[in-house]
Each structure stands twice: as structure tokens, then as C-alpha cells.
């Protein structure tokens, strides 16, 4: 091959490759890309035609020019494959855009289909809000506690009935002989608070508690809220005012008569149980009137031994505490007869006793219709 023919051949090959690559880049779909492939690499394609001319060349020319043509063929083949992947991705994006599925839940059109807030959740929020308005913080702790925090630091002596296996859920003893248990009250949270904070202290401690008991008014797991105030001047008058204001707000009455009876708890001295005045009308209880009394909580001044065991000097500080069952006051306020119904998960029951998310429950209209 003369120099002139070789130059023309190379110019034609470079121009051909550039044109083919431009056509590949401009192909807008698989069909257009396939047409370019046939035009370039098909049996009658332009590059195939160049390969056919190799037979007319000398062995040396065939070796040299054949390598150049094959290089151009490989370049075009790789460009075709790359463009094909791009077109596949574009096609997939277009299909996904046209087949978009709305995965958000459909709007419930009727109130009957709406979810309900469980009465216990509702009362938990009510209680927390009322005490928060009085300046109380919320303290929480673990459900699994040590015997030390659950009993010993709360002035329970060894051999106290509450420590017995038939009343408390114990875990197997640890290697050092200490025992873990499911807390029987939320008082261990008070212990943790006194050990970690310096007075003054003003907290409530809501949470789950556990005792080995099950009947119409008891379940193995139940909910409590306890309160604790520690400072230098707190006294029973402050405790009575707090409980009186809470009962007025929670039971939605302008006034409620309360009766404080002497009692005994290892962790308070003096200890008191609190009753509120009410009137029973068949299945309804009205608070703030009548001649009946209902026990709702226990309370008292924190025992000096508890303060000592929690690192607080009883010669400087004093305080009071109280505890009530969230399940019990839920039953009293909203007319629930059987405690076990709170935990059975009956959708029909929850539809009646539950609350819609945006409604404000009241004694008069608190229950869902």
C-alpha cells in the first residue's frame, strides 16, 4: 500500500469511528442503538466492509491494518455496551416514575375506623401533665431492680412479708449472692434520685411494677405513679395541698373532701392512707359529693432511715412521698369495672373506652361513643 493510500485509509477509519461514536451517543432508545450497531458491525456494516478489504492486502499490511480496524471495532463495541446500560437505566427510571405506588396509609374516612388512645396512656399523660404544672420533674428507672434498691434502702427489714417469693418475682441469685427482681413499686426510682441528686428534690416516678397477684382488681403487672419532695421545710400540710389539688384537677371537680387515715409503711413515718368522698350510683361514681369514701393512695413523711440510706442528712432535710395506682384511678375515673380488661387487647373494648387522638377527655364525655 502506497503512503497516499495508507493516509486515505487511516483518515477514512478515523472519520468513520468518530461518526459511529457520535451516532451511538445520540441514540435515544434501544431501537436506535441497535440500528447503529447494524450499520457499523452488521454483515454489511461499514467496519465489517473494512475488514473484508484485508484479503486484498499483503501479509504485512494485513497485520498492521487489521489491528487498527479491530481496535476501532472494539472501541465501537464498548461504546455500544456503555450506551446500552445508560438507556436501560433511563428506561427503568421512566418506568418507575410512571408506576409510582403511594405507600402512605389511606386516610380513614369514618370515625369508626380511627385508632384509639388506650385509657392507661391517656391517664398517664393526664397525671404527668397535672404534676408538671405544679413544678414536678419526671424520673424513670429500670423495671429490673436490686433487692437493695427495692427493699433495703426503703427500710424494709429482713423477713418482711413483701420480700417473700410468693409476693415478688425474683431472678436466680447472682454469683455474689445478691438478687435481682422485678420492682414491686416505683420507689426504687426515688432511691436512685436521692442518691444521684442533691436536695431540693421534686419528682414524680411513673412506671410499670410487678407483684405475684391476679384477680378482678389485681394483675401481675400494673402501673404506679409515686411522688417525692425533699427540702428543708416540707411538711404534711404541703403534702395534703398537693394531693387535694391533684384530685380536683384529675377528677374534674371544684372541690373534693379527702380523709387521711393513719397507716404503716416501712419507708414513711408518719404514714397515711387517703380516701376521697364520693357517691355511688349503680355503675357510676361521682366525686365531690355523697357519703361514701374510696381509698386512692398511700403517703407520708419520708422515714429518716430512708434519708440516711440514700445519703441525705435527716437532721437537715425532710420530705414526703406518695404513691397511687394508675390502673386504679383510671378505673375510677372512667367507670372500668375489671382491671384485667385494661390488658386483654379487645379492640371492641378499646373502641368504647379509648380516646381519639385530638379529643379532650372529660368526665361527662370522656368515653368514645
UniProtKB/Swiss-Prot annotation:
It holds the Pfam family Phe_tRNA-synt_N. The keyword Endoplasmic reticulum does not apply. Transmembrane segments: none annotated. PROSITE patterns: AA_TRNA_LIGASE_II. The keyword Aminoacyl-tRNA synthetase applies. Keywords: Aminoacyl-tRNA synthetase, ATP-binding, Cytoplasm, Ligase, Magnesium, Metal-binding, Nucleotide-binding, Protein biosynthesis. Mg(2+) binds at residue 269. GO terms for biological process: phenylalanyl-tRNA aminoacylation. SUPFAM superfamilies: Class II aaRS and biotin synthetases, tRNA-binding arm. Its EC number is 6.1.1.20. It is an enzyme of class 6 (ligase). Binds 2 magnesium ions per tetramer. InterPro entries: aa-tRNA-synth_II, aa-tRNA-synth_II/BPL/LPL, Phe-tRNA-synth_IIc_asu, Phe-tRNA_ligase_II_N, Phe_tRNA_ligase_alpha1_bac, Phenylalanyl-tRNA_Synthase, tRNA-bd_arm. It is found in: Cytoplasm. Its main location: cytoplasm. NCBIfam families: pheS. Tetramer of two alpha and two beta subunits. Belongs to the class-II aminoacyl-tRNA synthetase family. Phe-tRNA synthetase alpha subunit type 1 subfamily. This is Phenylalanine--tRNA ligase alpha subunit.
